[in-house]
Amino acid sequence: MERKSAAGSIRNKERSKKKNFLDAVGEILKTKGYAALKINDIAATAGVDKKMIYTYFGGMDGLMDEYIRSQDYWSKMTPGDTAPNFDDHGRAFAKELLLAQYDYVHKNKEAQKLLLWRLSEPRKSLKKMTDTQEENGEALFKFVADPFFGERAKEYRAIMSILVSGLYYLNMYASLNGSIFCGIDLNTPEGRDTVKKAISFLVDQTYDNLNTKQE
């Protein structure tokens, strides 16, 4: 029994150290930006020997990969998440995903910094994040939207690309250099609710007017 307890304690300590490294990456990213993500600074912030980065993650790239996976909203979405009832051909689910993304990025400063990093520097782990997003998105499109929109499925995908990127931009804009966009204060509950209503309206209009089949 004591041996099992000791083994469990060791595993907990290992998990705690790994989490310290991931938290350190997030803290540095939030406060200093991606350019400050150096192995010595990460180890110092985590309070763990830098050699353990190689033990737990195989090196800096492995650490960055795991951190990015933990923060990116769309990389977490997989075909297994498409469990809801799709009698409406994904209309409600599309709204749910977009609104959840809007709130997630708004509340998560690390995700905001990750977006800036992604636009500022070529990096294998960031490219991998993009590839994972596309793979997950492709599965969702094929499983839910393409059968309903038929020959106009590409137009639906284009509309979704505009909505996803637009919501990213509105959050970044409100967080960095201003809050008023097209006369809407994006940092107030009222302003954000207005954007959310617009998203629901646009999804409804897409489903009502773009489909080649009757719901």
Label the predicted regions.
Residues M1-S16, N211-E215:
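N-terminal intrinsically disordered/low-complexity leader segments
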Residues N20, A24, I28-G62, E66:
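Helix-turn-helix
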Residues I39, I68-S75:
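Short, basic, alpha-helical segments at the C-terminal edge of helix-turn-helix-like DNA-binding modules
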Residues M64-Q71, M129:
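Alpha-helical DNA-contacting segments of helix-turn-helix folds
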Residues E66, P79-K107, A111, I159-M160:
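Hydrophobic alpha-helical connector segments
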Residues S75-M77, A83, L114, P122-F149, ...:
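Amphipathic alpha-helical packing segments from all-alpha helical-bundle domains
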Residues V105-K127, A174-F181:
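Amphipathic alpha-helical segments used for helix-helix packing
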Residues A145-S200, K213-E215:
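Hydrophobic/aromatic-rich alpha-helical bundle segments in the mid-to-C-terminal region
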